[in-house]
Structures are given as structure tokens and as C-alpha cells.
Amino acid sequence: MNTSQDVNAEAANERSALLPRFLGSHRGNVPENTDTYALTPLFYWIRSTSVGLLLITIICHLFLLLNIFISIPIISHLSPGFMPVGFTALAAILLAMQIMFVYSPNAPERVTQRIICFLLAIDVLVVFLSPILRHREGWRSNAFVLWAFLMSLWIVITDLMLFRQYKEEHPDYDAIAHRGYYWSWSPSTWPWRQVGSLTASTILSVILTILTIHTLVTLIMRAYDGALSAPGQLYTVTDSKARVHLECFGSSSSNNKTTVLVEGGEVSVHPFKEWLLNLQHTSPDLYEESKDFEGYENDVKPYLSPDTRVCVWDRPGMGWSDNIGSPSSVGIVMDLLTEALAQADVSGPYVLVAHGIGGVYSNVFAARHLSEVKGIVFVDAGSVQTLKDSGQFLSRFLLFVRGWLSPLGINRIFGSIFMGKTRQDRVYGMYSWTSDRWVKSKIEESLTGPSFSRYELQSAQSVLPKDLPVSVISAGKSMKRFKKWPDEQRQLSKLTQRTVWDIVNNAPHDVWLSDDGGDLIMKRLGEIIYGGWPN
């Protein structure tokens, strides 16, 4: 019966190596039938080329990381920037694994290499066939997905080249492998190092395959979510081709010319809009009966007239709006809103309704449109302290980590499978924080908040007319939960001499979700629109 020793003892021929052909061999301590590739000129050429490709990939990755914080021409400024970062990281890991484990390729690694290459090919098709991904990412961002695929294809092809050379140098490979002697090594030459390398490369290859599956599913979900039609209109602003979403409803030809302009908070404005839309569409009978409502005072209607024009918009990165270049301050964002309103032919007077961080934006907007703003309603809104806190190092770091991991879509996939979240939830609902566009917008706020945006806000607050009606409505739960929140609300209550501060006990941050909070918002809004504001 043949043994591995018998195989190793076969007579030498013209193909036999005179010296051991791999690193670390000493006087025949390693069997001839090793699965290590010979260190031929082809091997060295492939290795040096892979090292060069790895260096190029790492340099691109570093530039892409810089682009998240400061826009550079390397990719489209409409892109959140995290997708190319993720795919260059994946390409770098693939090349690093090839360089580390090229001495001892194995069957599991070869299988996963081909699976990853196939998955990346599908990724390329998705990003180039999806209209929304082509628009938001641009061809330069999508090119990095193609780069990751080409690096994976390079690894597969070079492995085939080396494997073919190996089989030429070992004509008995197929027979040995078929009889099962290829792995039969004597205890005296047991390759513990090689077993460890085999295990590590197999585990890493499986992990990379899973991560590549995640990137594919995430791209498909992004393309699917992006196909959701936007209510209202998308307006192209500035020369950047960025599109912002603006929706107006109600009559623009009614006797009441006031426009209610709603600014969202930490997520898209649409959860707030849906509540306001229901009230704005209140039947005329209920509208007339509202005069008998308990909170009716001084002929003030607690519901909006059905013909009142209400406009809502999504800030860059929220809802259907594109991201813009970095850095962007509150003032820059408000310039985009002004341009969108001009294109939509929506003029004042305005009554501003702002929720959460949106209070900062509405404050700056009011200062830039002093003659057109009729009043402001702050709904548990932030101010200067909110901008200061947004620049904390831990907050920035966690946002960056979330963005760096966003191409994997862990939260998106988890929410869709286990929590039943729909694309409506991911685009404009409370689950929109899982979007890489949302993360990019929050990074923008954290970068400029403590500096540029804070100075813009302080300047805006100093020029507001002292007789401007301002309503500050604070959530009781927020007042109890956050230590600095009462002081910030007190600061807002001193904006003008006609500021009224209300605290809704036991109301959440989304004040309108409570009955008392919703009634109070409409009461204050009606007082500003129809008259009756306290002097």
C-alpha cells in the first residue's frame, strides 16, 4: 500500500527543484508535496503588483475619509461619502489578505474569493443601473465600487495563474490529491504554522463574504428606498445640482396670505407634517365649531383654516433632499431654502414653526427675512447650547463610526427583518437615522455647530425685532430628562418682548403627540395668524 513517504521518495526528474522553494525551509524539513506556491518571478511580480495596488487603495481611502469632513473633487459632493469609503476598505482588506496568505492558498479561500467577486459584480450593476444612486453618488463614487470588483477579480485571476504554475511543477498533484495523500505529512514535519494560516485565512474569508453580502443588500435597499416618489417638488438649488424637497398644500389665492413654514427636527419634517396636514384638512364644520372650543379665546381658532397655505421642506440629507458639500453651516442651508421658495413662488408673510434642532435654522431664516416673518413657534426647540453640544468629540466620533459602518447597512437590515420597518420609515420616518445621508447631515451640524453656525445664530437672535410674536413650547419630559434643557428654553423665552413660554407637562419631545401639546401648538399658531397675540 502506498503512503505519503512513498510518494515523497519518488525519483527526481528534470522538474524537481534543487533547493526548497519557499521561505523557512531547511535541509528538507518540509515535504516536497507542499501546497505552498514556488517563489518564481511570476510570484514576485504578482506580489509586488498587489502591494502597489494596496498602497493606491489605502491612499484613496484616506482621501475619501478627508472628503467626509472637507469636500474635495475626488467624488460628487451630493454623495454622503461613506459608500466609496466602505468599498475601498473592502478592497484594501482583500488585497492585504492576498499578500498575507498567498504562500498557502486553500480551497475554502478560493471558493470565497470567487463568491466575493461575483457579489461585487452585482454591486457594480446595482450602482450603475439605479438612477438614484447614479444621481447621488455620481460616477466617481460608483467607480470605487468598480475598483473593489476589479481588485477582487485580480485576486481570482492571479490565484489561477499561480495555481496553474504549481500544477505544472507538480504533475502528480491530481493523483496525490485524489488518493488523499496530499495532506498526509509525517509528525516530524507537521506544519503548525501553515495550519494556523489556513484557519485564519478561512475565517477571514468567510467574514469578508458575509460583509460583502451586507453591502449588496444595502445597495439594493438604497436603490429601492430611493425609488419612493416624493410628495411636492424637488428643486435644484445653487450650481451644485443638489435637489431639495419642498411641499406646499392649501390655497395660495385665499384671503389669508400667510404661509406656515414648517422646519423639522432631528429627522425629516414629515412626521410633524402629517399631524399638521390632518388639522389643516379639518372639515369646515369642525372649523366653525372650534369657536365653541374650550381653548378658544379672543376669537382665536385652534385649528387652521382649510385654505391656509402650509409648506414643509427637508434639509439636506433629510427625507428626499440631497446632501451638499462640506462644511455647510446653518446659514448656507437657509440660503438653499430661500432659493427653493423663490423657485416655488412662495412668498411671505411667513409664520415659522420649528421643532428640535430646526429652531436654530428657523431663527437664522427669520433674521434674514425680517420684513416677511410674522411670528415664530418653537416646539421644544434647541438654541445656542444645542450647537455647542453637537461638537463634542464623543458625539462626532460615534457619528463617524456609524457612517464608516453604514455601507454594511446593519441597522437597515435588522430593522427591515426583525422590526418590520418599511422604506417609508427609512426615508422620512423615525427610522431615517439609519440612512448614511442622515449621518452625513449630522456630521455637518457637529462640524460647524460650535463655530460658524453658533455665531450665525447669535447674530440672528440679536437682530430679531423686539415686538415679534414668539411662542416657546417646551416638553415636560425633556425639561426633566436633560439638565441643560430648562436653561436653553429660558434663553429662548427672552428672544423678544412678546415671547410667550409654555411648558406642556408629561409631553414627549414630539409635543404634538400629546393632546394638550397639540392643542397648544394650534392655539399659539392661530393667535399669530389670525390676531390676538398678547402684547
Curated annotation (Swiss-Prot):
Any idea where this protein resides?
A: Membrane
Query: Transmembrane among the record's keywords?
Result: yes
Transmembrane spans: 55-75, 82-102, 115-135, 143-163, 201-221, 346-366
Q: Which GO terms describe its cellular component?
A: cytoplasm; fungal-type vacuole membrane
UniProt signal peptide: none
Keywords attached to this entry: Membrane, Transmembrane, Transmembrane helix
Indicate what this protein is called per its UniProt record. Answer: Uncharacterized protein C23C11.06c
Whether Membrane counts among this entry's keywords is yes
GO MF term list: hydrolase activity
Q: How does it sit in the membrane?
A: Multi-pass membrane protein
